[in-house]
């Protein structure tokens, strides 16, 4: 199988590339022109990132990786998104996995930052679909990332793939993002939208940030601690992508979350046990709001009790279905 990936140097993209290569598949890394396709000191941006995180770069098995330059600003212009040689690498590919997007929690949400979050998701996805339309023998499947932020702050409501969207910034962002991906259906492509929960990984994503106060013995719940957290391990997230790539009967929305969401207070207690630290120092909601503003409301205090209904219907078997075993597994990763 030949799979084209955007966002290949991110947390999920790196792990997915590694997984596909181990099984002998070909990965085409779609790199925006001038955004890291060149090597520095013999390493790509993804390889440098992994070294900084204490990880080795993905090792090739029988598979291989090809890097292709892409100009994501040609949708309404006469220019070509790919050079002639790069275009050949994408023609005939089986699928595209769209994981591009600036970090949601990387910086506070100024208006400029919000614009970047939108452009790195909705705009890039629009340009991707437009570029695919220009191919003569393009991929037949688009697997595009989204997030459970789609649902907004919903208290104790049980959220399935059929639940209507919320109306805060993250919900609107996810709706815009997904709307651009759905346009690929007009090209005859099978489109799968993956709404990821909090991805647990030792060397990236939210977990290392969550662990910081615990390392200093001051960890605890956030706000009331009653808000629901829907999570998934990186291992399961990658396996879900692999399965929807291979199962051509799957299309539409899939919630990529474990079957047992937990309240924030319970998550804090489980994390404290996993790292052998107390979890008795709550972070008051007012302090979080003063420090982080809207981002605190949407990322730390919002409640999203999401269920993986589609995955359960498909018979997916989670490697780590409960939080305690998931944290134990994740924190012992090399």
Regions found by a protein language model. Give the residues of each.
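Mid/C-terminal beta-alpha module of Rossmann-like enzyme folds, strongest
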Residues: 2, 244-294, 328-334
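N-terminal Rossmann NAD(P)H-binding glycine-rich loop of SDR-like oxidoreductase domains
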Residues: 3-23
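Conserved Rossmann-fold NAD(P)-dependent oxidoreductase catalytic core, especially the SDR/UDP-sugar
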Residues: 114, 126-168
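Conserved beta-loop-beta element that borders a ligand/cofactor-binding pocket
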Residues: 146, 179-202
């Amino acid at each position: 199988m030949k799979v084209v990936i955007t966002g290949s140097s991110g947390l999920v993209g790196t792990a997915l590339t590694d997984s596909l290569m181990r099984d002998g598949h070909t990965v085409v890394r779609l790199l925006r022109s001038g955004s890291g396709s060149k090597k520095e000191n013999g390493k790509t941006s993804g390889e440098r990132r992994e070294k900084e995180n204490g990880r080795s770069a993905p090792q090739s098995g029988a598979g291989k990786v090809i890097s292709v330059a892409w100009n994501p600003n040609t949708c309404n212009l006469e220019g070509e998104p790919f050079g002639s040689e790069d275009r050949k690498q994408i023609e005939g590919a089986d699928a595209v996995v769209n994981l591009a997007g600036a970090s949601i929690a990387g910086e506070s949400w100024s208006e400029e930052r919000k614009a970047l979050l939108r452009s790195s998701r909705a705009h890039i996805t629009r340009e991707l679909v437009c570029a695919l339309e220009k191919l003569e023998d393009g991929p037949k499947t688009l697997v595009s990332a989204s997030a459970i932020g789609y649902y907004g702050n919903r208290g104790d409501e049980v959220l399935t793939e059929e639940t209507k969207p919320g109306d805060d910034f993250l919900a609107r962002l996810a709706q815009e993002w997904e709307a651009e991906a759905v346009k690929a259906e007009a090209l005859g492509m099978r489109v799968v939208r993956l709404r990821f929960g909090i991805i647990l990984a030792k060397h990236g994503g939210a977990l290392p940030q969550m662990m910081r106060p615990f390392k200093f013995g001051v960890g605890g719940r956030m706000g009331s601690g009653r808000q629901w957290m829907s999570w998934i391990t990186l291992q399961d997230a990658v396996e879900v992508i692999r399965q929807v790539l291979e199962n051509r009967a799957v299309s539409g929305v899939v919630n990529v979350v474990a079957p047992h969401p937990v309240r924030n207070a319970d998550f804090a207690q489980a994390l404290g046990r996993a790292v052998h630290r107390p979890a008795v120092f709550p972070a008051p909601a007012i302090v979080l709001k003063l420090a982080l503003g809207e981002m605190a409301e949407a990322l730390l205090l919002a409640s999203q009790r999401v269920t993986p209904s589609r995955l359960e219907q498909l018979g997916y078997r989670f490697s780590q279905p409960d939080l305690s075993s998931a944290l134990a597994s994740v924190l012992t990763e090399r």
